[in-house]
């Protein structure tokens, strides 16, 4: 899904943690019982987002959303990783929203600026691919319609 990125911030998304590393993060959260430390939850969410498994990525985003809501001191970090996670799963609308919120508070944040540029490039690229597919489908449809009309004559 991700080629070599020109943005260092996105390169960290390309490498998943090993299942053993992810297990260590999960075990840490579970060992803390009913009320795990926010940092432990954040670390686990980060590991989940780096995963290549879509459901795990969504779980990581969900954990970060809860942390963002419940732990004001972690909002900055949560916003950034919510943007990264949303980007990774292809939810560019939310990725943009999170990056914009971060940039509203920190307009000079280079990582957030790079992420926003990358989101824009990805949306543009996927839009062009979509236009190409739609154009191809239209051409096929016109060709079939033309053939049918000639056949009726």
Curated annotation (Swiss-Prot):
Pfam families: Fis1_TPR_C, Fis1_TPR_N. The keyword Ion transport does not apply. Coiled coil: none annotated. It is a single-pass membrane protein. It is found in: Mitochondrion outer membrane. Keywords: Membrane, Mitochondrion, Mitochondrion outer membrane, Repeat, TPR repeat, Transmembrane, Transmembrane helix. Residues 149-153 are mitochondrial intermembrane. GO terms for biological process: autophagy of mitochondrion; mitochondrial fission; peroxisome fission. CDD domains: Fis1 (cd12212). TPR repeats lie at residues 76-109. The chain crosses the membrane at residues 128-148. One of its GO terms (cellular component) is mitochondrial outer membrane. Belongs to the FIS1 family. Has a role in mitochondrial fission. Has a role in outer membrane fission but not matrix separation. The C-terminus is required for mitochondrial localization, while the N-terminus is necessary for mitochondrial fission. This is Mitochondrial fission 1 protein. It comes from Debaryomyces hansenii (strain ATCC 36239 / CBS 767 / BCRC 21394 / JCM 1990 / NBRC 0083 / IGC 2968). The gene is FIS1.
């Amino acid at each position: 899904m991700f080629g070599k990125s020109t943005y260092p911030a996105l390169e960290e998304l390309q490498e998943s943690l090993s299942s053993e590393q992810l297990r260590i993060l999960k075990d840490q959260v579970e060992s803390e019982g009913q009320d795990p430390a926010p940092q432990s939850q954040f670390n686990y969410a980060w590991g989940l987002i780096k995963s290549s498994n879509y459901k795990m990525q969504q779980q990581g985003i969900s954990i970060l959303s809860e942390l963002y809501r419940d732990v004001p001191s972690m909002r900055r970090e949560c916003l950034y990783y919510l943007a990264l996670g949303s980007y990774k799963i292809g939810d560019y609308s939310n990725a943009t929203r999170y990056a914009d919120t971060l940039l509203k508070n920190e307009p000079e944040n280079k990582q957030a600026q790079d992420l926003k540029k990358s989101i824009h490039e990805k949306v543009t690229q996927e839009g062009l691919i979509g236009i190409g597919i739609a154009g191809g489908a239209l051409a096929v449809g016109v060709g079939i319609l033309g053939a049918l009309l000639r056949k009726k004559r």
